[in-house]
Amino acid sequence: MADPENTVLVLGLGDLGQRVVDVLSHRPGGRLVAAARDAEHARSVAGQAALVAALCGGPRTVEPAVVDLAEPDTIAELLVRLQPDVIVLTASRLTWWRVPERARVLPYGAWLPLHVTLVRSLMEARNAARVAAPVVALPFPDAVGPVLAGAGLAPETGAGNVLEMATKLAVVVAERAGVTLEAVDVRLVAHHATERIAFSAFGGLGGDEGGPIGPPPLHAGVSVSGEAMPDDEVRELLTAAYPLLSGPATHELTAAATAATVWALLSDQPRRLHVPAPAGRPGGYPVRVSRAGIELDLPPDMKEADAIAVNAVAARWDGIERIEPDGAFVYCRWVSDALERTLGVRIERVEPAESDAIADDLEARLARV
């Protein structure tokens, strides 16, 4: 956000959204807009962030905005008025740490319809507003991106997930090798489902109702000062215990990953990063990011089709058997069985036209658990 003319819009000011605004307020930039449905809450978040920005040399201006993310027309009006350079969507209809205790037997992928709704609403609004700003969508991007890609509504990228795992690898390897982070090169192809084996703080996201045996597939390449590390050592370090706070406190990490993605999207020079769902691909990838866009930066020995295949299979550890080219998705059978036992509804396949109705039904059933 170094350019004083840049505008970054953050949509949704729940726990994660507030933390994203806070991290963005610590670095120089132009205008930071914090938008929520509740006007008083938006004013409070923006007001505090404005003081932080003043103290830390952050954005030139921080201001609130009011928007209902369930209404594409009002989103479009806001986008036309603000003309943002980057849009960050943090809001979802279901937050992972608020899933009722009884429903936590289900994997994260069971709630995919609840994550699709607001992202699609934003993408439709952006199209209507004819705004070109890239969207960084945080609700379950590894799966939401490919679901919406079938309709041409995939956000440019997600944030967090694979970047958090890649950063863990870089930090642990640098510490072990006694080198700076700059000497460590990490290229990780990994799905959201892998994060719970990299960080025990996310272990509960897999549920406990069956599922595939063993860890999800991934591809991890690490080199130190140009020397490649053995694959088995890399995997050992990726899955080694690592201390993290629990619950929503981990949103601080996701907020930092989101800010890194935003700053890269505002940079004239490409920055090496990892992101989930670039251009609607499933799972996460190493990339080069700049104002010009996002390009894959895969390991030299890996083709794009192979990387996509790794993540498509890994999605089964989140309970998603497959995502069709048109955006329909199929639950793994064990998830359909668990939904029936837990919530009294059996869902095997979700067509794009059915997604909102199924999301409404899941939301209502969760409220009764």
Sequence positions of predicted segments:
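Glycine-rich Rossmann-fold phosphate-binding loop(s) that bind the pyrophosphate
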Residues: 13-14
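N-terminal Rossmann-fold NAD(P) dinucleotide-binding loop
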Residues: 17-18
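Glycine-rich phosphate-binding loop and adjoining beta1-alpha1-beta2 segment
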Residues: 31-59
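Rossmann-fold cofactor-recognition segment
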Residues: 53-71
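Conserved Rossmann-fold cofactor-binding substructure of NAD(P)-dependent oxidoreductases
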Residues: 67-82
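NAD(P)-cofactor binding segment of oxidoreductase domains
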Residues: 104-130
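Rossmann-like dinucleotide-binding core of oxidoreductases
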Residues: 121-127, 131-219
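Long, compositionally biased stretches enriched for glycine and/or charged residues
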Residues: 178-369
